[in-house]
A protein has these predicted regions:
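N-terminal loops that bind phosphate or other acidic moieties
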Residues: 2-146
């Protein structure tokens, strides 16, 4: 059981959380979003992210979903890997970049799984959610013609 933190460029993180609330009705307190404005100082961004991480982590575990690898939100998120929770326990953090809606839906659906399992299922959900629709139409057409 891990907390889930969405860290992305403004307004992506909060928009993703709003989408999850729309789909699931309500979202547990251990799932939050932090938007990173374009010109915010990285130190300020990190302090906001750290505060949110400490609020949502469960049993010292945290899954972070971020939008773009190498961008400020992902870089800020990576600094969480060396942090401790409020009890002084080193956080166990898994960070996934490339956030998409299927990834988020998978994370929310499996929110009570162990961190490693949650991260793997979430990653698979994000990858499986990327499709080329024309290719799918061809497959469906072929199946119908048989």
């Amino acid at each position: 059981m891990a907390g889930i933190l969405i860290i992305a460029h403004t307004p992506i993180a909060s928009a993703m959380l709003s989408f999850a609330e729309h789909v699931y009705g309500s979202i547990p307190e251990h799932i939050q979003a932090v938007d990173i404005p374009a010109h915010e100082d990285a130190k300020i961004s990190f302090e906001r992210v750290l505060t949110a991480a400490k609020a949502v982590e469960r049993h010292g575990e945290l899954l972070v979903l971020t939008d773009v690898m190498g961008a400020t939100p992902a870089n800020v998120a990576s600094r969480l890997m060396t942090q401790q929770n409020s009890s002084g326990v080193k956080l166990k953090v898994q960070i996934l970049a490339g956030l998409n809606l299927p990834m988020l839906m998978r994370a929310v659906s499996y929110k009570d799984d162990a961190l490693d399992v949650l991260a793997q299922k979430t990653l698979q959900g994000g990858q499986n959610g990327i499709l080329r629709l024309g290719a799918m139409a061809n497959v469906q057409t072929t199946e119908v013609q048989d």
